[in-house]
Amino acid sequence: MSSSRPANSSSNPGRANQNARVVLTTLDAKIHADFEESGNSFDYSSSVRVTSAVGENSSIQSNKLTTAYLHHIQKGKLIQPVGCLLAVDEKSFKIMAYSENAPEMLTMVSHAVPSVGEHPVLGIGTDVRTIFTAPSAAALQKAVGFTDINLLNPILVHCKTSGKPFYAIAHRVTGSLIIDFEPVKPYEVPMTAAGALQSYKLASKAVNRLQALPGGSMERLCDTMVQEVFELTGYDRVMAYKFHDDDHGEVTAEVTKPGLEPYFGLHYPATDVPQAARFLFLKNKVRMICDCRANSAPVLQDEKLPFELTLCGSTLRAPHSCHLQYMENMNSIASLVMAVVINDSDEVVESSDRNSVKSKKLWGLVVCHNTSPRFVPFPLRYACEFLAQVFAIHVSKELELENQIVEKNILRTQTLLCDLLMRDAPLGIVSQSPNMMDLVKCDGAALLYKNKVYRLGATPSDYQLRDIVSWLTEYHTDSTGLSTDSLYDAGYPGALALGDVVCGMAVVKITSHDMLFWFRSHAAGHIRWGGAKAEPDENHDGRKMHPRSSFKAFLEVVKTRSTTWKEFEMDAIHSLQLILRKALSVEKAVAAQGDEIRSNTDVIHTKLNDLKIEGIQELEAVTSEMVRLIETATVPIFAVDADEIVNGWNTKIAELTGLPVDQAMGKHLLTLVEDSSVGTVVFLLALALQGKEEQGIPFEFKTYGSREDSVPITVVVNACATRGLHDNVVGVCFVAQDVTSQKTIMDKFTRIQGDYKAIVQNPNPLIPPIFGTDEFGWCSEWNQAMTELSGWRREDVMNKMLLGEIFGIQTSCCHLKSKEAFVNLGVVLNNALTGQISEKICFSFFATDGKYVECLLCASKKLHGEGTVTGIFCFLQLASQELQQALHIQRLTEQTAMKRLKTLSYLRRQAKNPLCGINFVREKLEEIGMGEEQTKLFRTSVHCQRHVNKILDDTDLDSIIDGYLDLEMSEFRLHDVYVASRSQVSMRSNGKAIQVVDNFSEEMMSETLYGDSLRLQKVLADFMSVCVNLTPVGGHLGISVTLTEDNLGQSVQLVHLEFRITHTGAGVPEEAVSQMFGSDSETSEEGISLLISRKLVKLMNGDVHYLREAGKSTFIITVELAAASKRES
């Protein structure tokens, strides 16, 4: 199937996105060139429209233009005058380039600070260390020795001549070290130590607000983010921008000071944020413009340098003139922008490293505007960057939730497809409800079948539709269909004549002459701006660059386009295409399908039975292994039922608490825990019984017997819901870790005020892995247990930055798996440093030997004797080998159950389609004359097919077992039900040479009754099947039926049926009989079948009994039905 735009191709989304961005970069270059050439006469709106058209329809003659544009972006030599810049050779510390304002800012003499000797001169070749005080020079020299110098930003330095403080922000580029110097304002308390933790403190309140938000609402998340940034930074306006799939943007949240025009709901063209700028946002997560009206300072470079310096990574890099003009037009004099970067689900970069690296994607921006010049110090900008990273993690989680909703929509669509197929194919999809418009979101749909057009909703006229078919036949001959969001861009000549009603189209061919169409109107019709009500032209010149002009230009660009067709929508359309093709081909070959009815049914039965046997056997094996592990485990394991009564208590938990197993069983769990833990346990049980499983929750048990005088037992538990056979929660199982000794040590740490080294460095195996930092984030503790766990010696890590150097994602000692893990670690450390109670979190890293260590991390503040915070202690809790094995078995069990569930769900859905085909063939065969014997066989086949359908529909076994199933009542002949049931065991009974004897009168079997015939048929077939399986070769099977009538007044006549199925042999095992009567919790394949059948019989006001006699056994099945003849009278 073809697509008119590469960006819409579903075959390779990553490659398509890349191609689209190349096109957009060309458009960006053209607009930039137009602006530079036109100056004040630049017409923004028309430029966007013209370049959009040219970019997509003309040959690329602008390679030179694009190259020049990108060179201009990367090699610009201007900075903002709020600070200055130096480029330094790392080996000699000599200056290679400097901004024109650097000498004045860094070497100007201050009369308030006395100086001795000659004043340093700043120029090409000057040693940068001579400009600053000795401690500052030493700090710069130390920073150069770091592999990742960004970890040390900002570096506080003081000028030698003036004594003025500056923040030095350094980064490496090819051939030099670029250092931005930003003055520390007089009102600002300078940050005396570098490191992320110092900056993270500034954003702690905002981070906590985001962390506390419940999931499920992207709107609430964005609103909270802009509000927190608004309060944190003090800008006049804060907005959240989201980039859509076609790269156009939308303001999804906004907070402003009173009196400012709102921009909420604004959409703007993709070219408003150029692709080059987006690329830079992936590298530099925060961008500040202090004053768009200030004159930029040029950077002077050593003419002897063999290369050009790039300032892309500079915090002071000057904005481009086009952007400055845009800012001034909207009266935004200063801005601060934070990038929201997430993993790109469409692109994965393969790596030979221990991890594959997912490429990053710019989801959107958080943008701050101010109506007057504004400077934000680097520490606060660093805090904003951290906040944006936390926000990005939550955005990713919300997107995952949205993807789950999409998956549910796909399941809904698959159900709808089966429903559509049950109709008169293919006309039923347009003549009945639901119809083909319900399959995907659209404004209209049409079916071209046998040269006749059937239309639904907003569609082209019959003449226009046939014109589209002619165009498809001429230009897309080899394609089975086409999807486009713009018929105009796809090259359809009559697109403009269709107007706004039809812009996008998806079409598929059923046959060479029959087609399905879906249509969408223009995207602008669905877009509303939530800003001020005034028309753009009333207040603004549409030619100028302004948000309203952007919105107007965007509407102009998308007026011939619809919303794009999602990949899952096209999958649904393709599925319907394939199903209809099959249905139409079946119609042409009805005669050849007669024998296929029985074979398809047998195949489905065989697959279901094989799957059921395999799944139950595998689950039984895993269950047995789990029971053995629990009984012999050296970790505490206990369990409760749905009433919170203890029904599991292994040896280890009995040993720890002093409460024997026999005394613990039957007690309420809340009576066994300390009063201080009751609230925690109640909350934990409530979640677990709802199926919401929690991990790493601490609480305390009381002690009994010989341990009654001991301290309470502290455990950390993982709670997992115990589920019954039908996936209902029947209890909770707790796998625990005894942390009493660890808690004792931690309590001792919080009380200690002197020398703690004797505890931390103690090689006792009871001491857990411990590491710590000072208040600035430098590693100050690393005990022996941590050395053994990580492979890094104490002397290797001491005085290194914990975030970045020790735990990081690039050149760190202990490699973390993802940026998200790094940000989460920063959040935990920040919470501990600010004195907040932090719960244990899952923490993982790679040791030196490549082993992946998984553990729980608990961070707590370290206090000085006077109570001041001096750093952080971190404790790691490792799962024992037995617990790890138990958790591994648990994961395997869950994976096996999920695999079986998915397979059964898939098989159920797939079985529907051939059954629908069989149903279609049956209807055609009914139109063909058949003999009497053929008719009897045909009717038996029909009943068996309906039986299979009913089995596939009866997936809610809980309703059957609990007696809530609604029976489907209809008239039927007892003979038909019996023959259909008997036919299902005939092949097996013949194969075992079993003599089957029927004992009933033909007159009785011809009775017409009223009840649920299919479920009665299922019951009889199940009991007959069990008997045939247990009857030995050459054995005997007798089936007798008796019928008695009971008059209830004149209008109702009840019929009592009794079936006796007698078989020779050993009989049904006692376990299966117990399972049939529900007295055994364990359920085998045979047992569940008997249990469900007995429950169905109970719904028919009957029951099942099983009698054992010498050499034979009998099932006695009684049901109560109504006589159809009396009912009619």
Swiss-Prot record:
- Keywords (A to Z) from UniProt: Chromophore, Photoreceptor protein, Receptor, Repeat, Sensory transduction, Transcription, Transcription regulation
GO biological process annotation, one example = red, far-red light phototransduction
Identify the residues that the record assigns to the Histidine kinase domain, covering every copy: 906-1123
Q: Which Pfam families match?
A: GAF, HATPase_c, PAS, PAS_2, PHY
Which SUPFAM superfamilies does the record cross-reference, listed alphabetically?
ATPase domain of HSP90 chaperone/DNA topoisomerase II/histidine kinase, GAF domain-like, PYP-like sensor domain (PAS domain)
InterPro entries (UniProt xref):
GAF, GAF-like_dom_sf, HATPase_C_sf, His_kinase_dom, PAS, PAS-like_dom_sf, PAS_2, PAS_fold
Q: Which Gene3D superfamilies match?
A: 3.30.450.270, 3.30.450.40, Histidine kinase-like ATPase, C-terminal domain, PAS domain
Domain GAF, by residue range, is 217-399
Q: Does the keyword Transcription apply?
A: yes
Its PTM note reads: Contains one covalently linked phytochromobilin chromophore.
Source taxon at top rank = Eukaryota
Q: Which residues form the PAS domain?
A: 622-692, 755-826
Listed binding positions for phytochromobilin are 322
Give GO terms: molecular function aspect only.
Answer: photoreceptor activity; protein homodimerization activity
Q: What does this protein do?
A: Regulatory photoreceptor which exists in two forms that are reversibly interconvertible by light: the Pr form that absorbs maximally in the red region of the spectrum and the Pfr form that absorbs maximally in the far-red region. Photoconversion of Pr to Pfr induces an array of morphogenic responses, whereas reconversion of Pfr to Pr cancels the induction of those responses. Pfr controls the expression of a number of nuclear genes including those encoding the small subunit of ribulose-bisphosphate carboxylase, chlorophyll A/B binding protein, protochlorophyllide reductase, rRNA, etc.
Quaternary structure (record): Homodimer.
Similarity field? Belongs to the phytochrome family.
Q: What's the protein called, per UniProt?
A: Phytochrome A
